[in-house]
UniProtKB/Swiss-Prot annotation:
Residue span of region Disordered: 284-413, 429-476
UniProt feature, compositional bias: Low complexity: 360-369
Biased composition (Basic residues): 433-442
Record field: compositional bias (Polar residues): 449-458
Listed InterPro entries: CCDC61_N
Function of the protein: Microtubule-binding centrosomal protein required for centriole cohesion, independently of the centrosome-associated protein/CEP250 and rootletin/CROCC linker. In interphase, required for anchoring microtubule at the mother centriole subdistal appendages and for centrosome positioning. During mitosis, may be involved in spindle assembly and chromatin alignment by regulating the organization of spindle microtubules into a symmetrical structure. Plays a non-essential role in ciliogenesis.
Subcellular location: Cytoplasm, Cytoskeleton, Microtubule organizing center, Centrosome; Cytoplasm, Cytoskeleton, Microtubule organizing center, Centrosome, Centriolar satellite; Cytoplasm, Cytoskeleton, Cilium basal body
Modified residues (Phosphoserine): S330, S332, S371, S374, S446, S472
Name under which the protein is recorded: Centrosomal protein CCDC61
Cellular component GO terms, alphabetical: centriolar satellite; centriolar subdistal appendage; centrosome; ciliary basal body; cytoplasm; microtubule organizing center
Length: 511
């Protein structure tokens, strides 16, 4: 293995700087240590046998070449497992005794040579052990001034010789020096230009990124402008639709308000009519039949003389029928006002009253027939006079009702009033015809062409009048107006009144 020719390093031992020089020539190791402060020198030469024998005594044998490498590593401090230390003889004895474990005894008197000797210790540290290799270095004293002066002179001569040899190269060296300075300057400029180029590249990249960002922002702005135009168009159309909807809703609101006012007015009218119906169900004092007939004749003359509204004619006809009826208890079980108007009960009570009136009229007719036949002429004439008047009155009431009718409820009530008034005339004429048949058994009248033609015309006129009233929504005789149809109509009236009341409650809640 090739060994270095020589090595010199500065090493600090125990806080003092020393210069250590190592020279390996073949199988000989030359070692020299010099104190930088005092210029004292210690020098020693060791062959390969001495080194190997020393390592063998320590118990960790090393070859000469390996030992030299370890010494070199310790000087250059390239390995942490080997270090150096410089000890005196006293330090070495104390270290040896501490290693052997004995007490430090009294030291024997030492010579000056031992005191001046130094020991260079190569310390090899392993995992669980430390091995010391001591190398003794005899004291060489201080350098000789004569020798030093000779060395100085030889160095000066060598320097002059080198300068003489290089005298012709001074200009070249100067030029090289200038070129080196120029290279140094250009190198610094190159570094500056590289730095500037790097900054320029960064700026260019930043500018490119800025341009890309600007382009993306422009595209985003264009997209937003397009969306804005679309939204404006949609907003305009939506605003138009909303304005149309608002106008339509305002119109519907006005219509609803108008219908609400109409319904409130109708509800008020129906409430008043209901109150009148409830008042009509109360018990009234008995009145003579003659007064009832007079009032009915006055009512017929009034209806023939002028046009009367539907409500007033209905009230007057109810008042006339109420005065002409005999006194009967009210159909109400308690006699007080009912909490709710029941049209079915009202119709049943009305039919019951009509049957009672019919029976009363038949009884009066029997009594009149039993007392004598003097009343036949007036009764027949009265019936002949009453029927056209009743027909005229029924027509006028039907026309007036058809003009003032606003709903199916009012139409049905007007038909019920017409049925009640006309059924009385029909019953009365029926009783008169029966009395005629009874008189015909004892003394049949002689038929005349005038009476025959008048009877045919009266019958035909009555049938035509009934068909006309039935088609125009007027009264229909009780025989033709069945109880099943009455019950269906009354159920329809109940349903419509209930729906109207619920609608008015919803309107009140909404408002």
């Amino acid at each position: 293995m090739d060994q270095p020719a020589g090595l010199q390093v500065d090493y600090i031992f125990r806080g003092v700087e020393h210069a250590v020089r190592v020279v390996v020539s073949g199988q000989v190791l030359e070692l020299e240590v010099e104190d930088r402060m005092t210029a004292d020198q210690w020098r020693g030469e060791f062959d390969a046998n001495f080194i190997e024998d020393l390592t063998h005594k320590t118990g960790n044998f090393k070859q000469f070449s390996i030992f030299c490498n370890m010494l070199e590593s310790a000087l250059t401090q390239s390995s942490e497992s080997v270090t150096l230390d410089l000890l005196t003889y006293t330090d070495l004895e104390s270290l040896r005794s501490r290693k052997l474990g004995g007490r430090p005894g009294a030291l024997a008197p030492r010579s000056a040579q031992l005191n001046s000797k130094r020991y260079l210790i190569l310390i090899y540290s392993v995992e669980f052990d430390r091995i010391h290799y001591p190398l003794p270095l005899p004291y060489q004293g201080k350098p000789d001034p004569v020798v030093l002066q000779g060395i100085i002179r030889s160095l000066k001569e060598e320097l002059g010789h080198l300068r003489g040899l290089n005298g012709g190269q001074d200009a070249r060296e100067t030029e090289i020096w200038h070129l080196r300075e120029q290279v140094t300057r250009l190198t610094s400029e190159k570094r500056e230009l590289e730095a500037q180029l790097g900054r320029s590249r960064e700026e260019a990249l930043a500018g490119r990124a800025a341009r890309q960002e600007a382009e993306s922002l422009r595209g985003l702005v264009r997209g937003l402008e397009l969306e804005l135009r679309q939204e404006r168009g949609l907003g305009g159309r939506a605003a138009g639709r909303r304005s149309q909807d608002s106008r339509r809703l305002a119109k519907e609101l006005e219509e609803v308000k108008a219908s609400e006012r109409n319904l409130r007015a109708r509800l008020k009218t129906l409430n008043s009519e209901l109150a009148m119906y409830r008042r009509g169900r109360r018990t009234l004092p008995p009145v003579a039949v003659r007064e009832g007939r007079a009032s009915s004749s006055r009512e017929r003359s009034t209806s023939r003389g002028r046009a009367v509204t539907r409500s007033s004619s209905r009230e007057s006809s109810r008042g006339a029928r109420g005065r002409g009826r005999p006194a009967h208890p009210s159909p109400s079980p308690t006699g007080s006002r009912a909490p709710r108007f029941d049209p079915t009960a009202f119709v049943k009570a009305k039919e019951k009253k009509q049957r009672e009136i019919r029976m009363k009229q038949q009884q009066q007719q029997r009594n009149r027939m039993g007392s004598g036949g003097s009343g036949d002429g007036p009764s027949v004439s009265w019936s002949q006079q009453t029927r056209p008047a009743a027909a005229v009155t029924g027509r006028g009431d039907a026309v007036n009702r058809s003009r003032n009718r606003s709903s199916s409820v009012d139409s049905f009530r007007s038909r019920c009033s017409s049925v009640s008034s006309c059924s009385e005339l029909e019953d009365f004429s029926h009783s008169v015809s029966r009395s005629r048949r009874c008189r015909g058994r004892g003394k049949p009248p002689s038929p005349t062409p005038w009476s025959r033609s008048k009877t045919k015309s009266t019958t035909q006129e009555r049938s035509d009048h009934q068909r006309h009233l039935a088609s125009s929504g007027g009264w229909v005789p009780i025989k033709e107006y069945s109880s099943d149809f009455q019950g269906a109509d009354m159920a329809e009236i109940d349903a419509r009144l209930k729906a109207l009341q619920e609608y008015m409650n919803r309107l009140d809640t909404r408002s």
